[in-house]
Regions:
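Hydrophobic packing positions characteristic
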Residues: 87-202
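N-terminal, charged low-complexity regulatory/assembly segments
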Residues: 1-139
Length: 205
């Protein structure tokens, strides 16, 4: 059973930078299920420069997936803030799936807790809905429509972000968008639903 345990710890060294740093600086590693030789090997691997490079390559691959599926969210936050949040997310959350959709949705959950930015919730809601609509499903499985509530006119906000421009001072008016996958791709039906409710302003994070 030590081989399976060794492989699990080796995988953690690649994905958990804090664990890798502790072992690389001589901290006692996990003892359960490992021989003394295996523990020494893991400590040597943790200190090897090549392992950190491998971890950076994996993080870069994950960042590329997030940029692909969340381009409007990246445009809203800006490339620097988006990359910084992606780095924090990768440090906290090990790779959960090879599927782009799963990674992007988990990153949205991270952003929802980490960031407070005007337009962010509705833009992420829209991109999450697009991911769900395009997600591969088994043959015959239903693909439910997606509902997104915007507090600003999406006809103004989304085109600005698509051009790489951040929306500013867009009038608040609630819209409800219903998206569904048709024969020619994703279609949206958008209706104004009256003024958006006023909220106390919160400091951006």
């Amino acid at each position: 059973m030590t081989q399976a345990r060794f492989q699990r710890v080796l995988g953690r060294l690649v994905t958990d930078r804090d664990f890798r740093a502790r072992l690389g600086h001589g901290a006692a590693g996990p003892r359960s299920g490992l021989s003394a030789i295996e523990r020494r090997r893991l400590m040597a691997i943790a200190a090897a420069p090549g392992l950190a490079l491998t971890a950076r390559l994996i993080d870069s691959f994950r960042l590329g997936k997030l940029i692909t599926l969340l381009p409007l969210t990246r445009a809203l936050l800006g490339p620097v803030r988006f990359a910084r949040e992606a780095e924090a997310y990768c440090a906290k959350v090990p790779p959960i799936s090879f599927y782009l959709a799963d990674e992007a949705l988990a990153f949205c959950d991270h952003l929802r807790a980490a960031c407070r930015r005007p337009y962010l919730a509705e833009v992420m809601g829209y991109e999450r809905a697009m991911i769900e609509l395009k997600r591969p499903r088994p043959d015959g499985a239903q693909r439910p429509s997606q509902r997104v509530v915007f507090e600003h006119d999406p006809g103004l906000v989304l085109p600005l972000l698509a051009r790489g421009e951040r929306p500013r001072a867009v009038p608040r008016r609630r819209h409800v968008a219903i998206g569904f996958l048709g024969a020619d791709g994703v279609d949206w039906r958008i209706e104004a639903a009256g003024p958006a409710p006023r909220r106390a302003s919160r400091q951006e994070r």
